[in-house]
Design a protein with these regions (language model features):
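Active-site-flanking alpha-helical
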Residues: 78, 175-176, 209
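GST-like fold's C-terminal all-alpha helical module
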Residues: 102, 106-201
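GST-like domain detector, emphasizing the conserved glutathione-binding G-site
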Residues: 1-136, 140, 226-227
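Short, solvent-exposed turn/loop segments enriched in Gly/Ser/Thr/Pro and often Arg
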Residues: 10, 167, 212-215
């Protein structure tokens, strides 16, 4: 099956990393792939545009089936190959509801408060133009969001939706890993710290770890000394 799959992806992209974790969890580690370089705008190349008119990655093929959008790829893989590898969305109604809730909580809130509001502010705003009161508001919102997940992990004592690794973790963990890379001090969040160590050690995460993270320091560290 994996030999019929193909993924276009970029290193360090959370949208790319999520389906890569799913592919490993489902036992499809041998899938074909192409690592693109964002700085050269390779996502706008003809080979991707003919599959994804938006010129974005991840772009995924399973035989003749093309699936674009990170979350759609994750859900496609789980729904199509439910019986393969790790079951990431439970069949039990109560457990499924919990996982689905946490999936979409992470996708909406972690993306907005840690990435779009805080990280992108530092990327898109020159240092001399940054306003400390604006930074303080964004930092406070990020802290509040992280506090919610710290409490959640205090309740579950394991993963974000319960005792088992699930799609909720696939959608949540990369935001934490990226934030740690950019200076987040997990010493202030003991439950999240234990969670981070546990998930980081998973084979699926190690196999899909962004390669340039192993070789290059982050360009900016907006979380360092702030959270």
């Amino acid at each position: 099956m994996a030999e019929n799959m193909f993924l276009f992806w970029g290193s360090g992209s959370i949208p790319c990393w999520k389906p890569m974790i799913v592919l490993e969890e489902k036992g499809f580690g041998g899938y074909k792939n192409k690592l693109i370089t964002f700085s050269n705008k390779e996502q706008k190349g003809e080979d991707i545009l003919k599959l994804n008119p938006r010129g974005q990655v991840p772009t995924f093929k399973d035989g003749d089936i093309v699936v674009n959008e990170s979350n759609a790829i994750c859900e496609y893989l789980e729904c199509t190959y439910t019986d393969k590898g790790t079951q990431l969305i439970p069949t039990d109604k109560a457990k499924r509801a919990r996982v689905l809730q946490r999936m979409h909580e992470a996708a909406a809130n972690m993306q907005q408060k840690l990435v779009l509001d805080l990280l992108y502010y530092f990327i898109q705003t020159k240092e001399e133009d940054r306003k400390e009161d604006e930074v303080a508001k964004k930092v406070e919102a990020a802290k509040e969001e992280l506090g919610r997940w710290e409490a959640c992990l205090g309740e579950t004592k394991a993963f974000v939706a319960g005792p088992d690794f699930s799609m909720a973790d696939v959608w949540f963990y990369p935001f934490i890993a990226q934030s740690v890379r950019m200076g987040l001090d997990l010493g202030k969040f003991p439950n999240m710290n234990a969670y981070y160590d546990k998930v980081t050690a998973r084979r699926s995460v190690q196999k899909s770890w962004p390669p340039h993270w192993k070789e290059e320091p982050p360009i900016i560290s907006p979380f360092k000394g702030r959270i």
